[in-house]
Amino acid sequence: MPKLSETYSKWKSIGEGLLAIVLGLLLIRFGQVIPRMGYQLLMGYFSLSAVWHLLTRWFQDKKRRENIFVTLGKLVVAALVFDSIILQDLALYLLVFIIASYQLFTGIISLVTWSLYRKNAIHPRLHHLFDAVWMIGFGLYSISPFHDAANFELLLLGFYLLMLGASSLRDGFFFERIENNPKLKRRMRMTLPIFVTALIPISTLRKLNEWLSNHESQEGEVHSERKNDQTVDLEIFVHTSETSFFLAMGHVDICYQGTVISYGSYDPRSERLFGMVGDGVLFKANREKYIELCKRESQKTLFAYGLSLTEQQKAAIQARLAEIEDLLIPWEPSSQLMKRREGEVKHTYSYQLKEEADATLYKFSSSEFKTYFVLSTNCVLLADSIVGKAGTDILSPQGFIVPGTYQDYLDLEYTKPNGLVVSRSIY
């Protein structure tokens, strides 16, 4: 008999998928009518809410009772703006502006990625330039005040919601299916926008902290859970911390056969573009010492996801690790004291890794990982290039994955009875 949490996750995926598909079809068919109707429904909700507060105020405790003039003010404002064409147009333009801004954002990411690939003579790279041109073109066209691009952008949004809904429906309908993927082929998955999934690691941490504050006597139960008795062959760590914005977005690395493999911009002397670009550095470290360093140095919380692999998947991952090994050049971090981002003068983080976590560090002789870029050739892409050999889903056709996107996928896999993820731990 399936667990309640599994049943909930299954029907949640189906419900979200159906909702996204229906909304997508409505946007494709009716265009601007849908957001305008949504605006009116929102104003109608505010009006009814104000009326309800007005009718029930005499039954409420005086301390919780809203000031009658505030309630009347809400009612009057909602009634006045309910059918305001100007405000409807403003809300519609704001929606289009957000979509166009996201297109410009992803277009710039593609352009920077293409530029780095070109500098490092990486092929293929033309698709990144193509993505940059059409995404920036769409964004500039839609954000221009000289014409109305609302229907065009809503059409694109509708098709995006159809694909997003299809991914959710597939998750729901095949939730309990035992995967049979002998060729370890990867399936395409449509995910939420980067600016949404970027908040998942810190959001998960805050939920954990809230849970712990209410269950102090059972704190140990949160730190480790297993779905079944299958062995854990590979771990994926998702880090997050509330100490800075970049740490809040998270970091991803993997642990295979007791060794942590991580990738990032660990050479501060090579950093540029506000620290977003730098030489790509890979390190291998002792698992236990690395976890302790992360908790001590940056006050990080690590969410560890354990994957159970078949012999075929292990062989594919080991082959990929061997490919990466051929690209590595040993690198020694400087022992010189430097001013860190936190403002402290101390050894670089890469030097601490070497001294405190028994890490060996490397740079890349070639490949897309020669230069690190926080929004494309980042820690998640390196981890995914390894774990993906086990047949996990492709989370971005463009290769832009943030830690939150990966964590969302791993959490979903854990809820599936036959999913790849068999354990979750928190450090």
Positions of predicted regions on the chain:
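Membrane-anchoring hydrophobic segments
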Residues: 1-83
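Juxtamembrane "helix-exit" motif on the non-cytosolic side of transmembrane helices
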Residues: 26-33, 58-59, 82-90, 114-117, ...
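Activation targets extended, charge/polar-rich intrinsically disordered C-terminal tails
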Residues: 17, 36-39, 43-51, 56, ...
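Conserved, well-structured beta-alpha core segment at the onset of a catalytic domain
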Residues: 94, 106, 113, 125-129, ...
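Membrane-interface segments at or immediately adjacent to transmembrane helices
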Residues: 181-246, 250-252
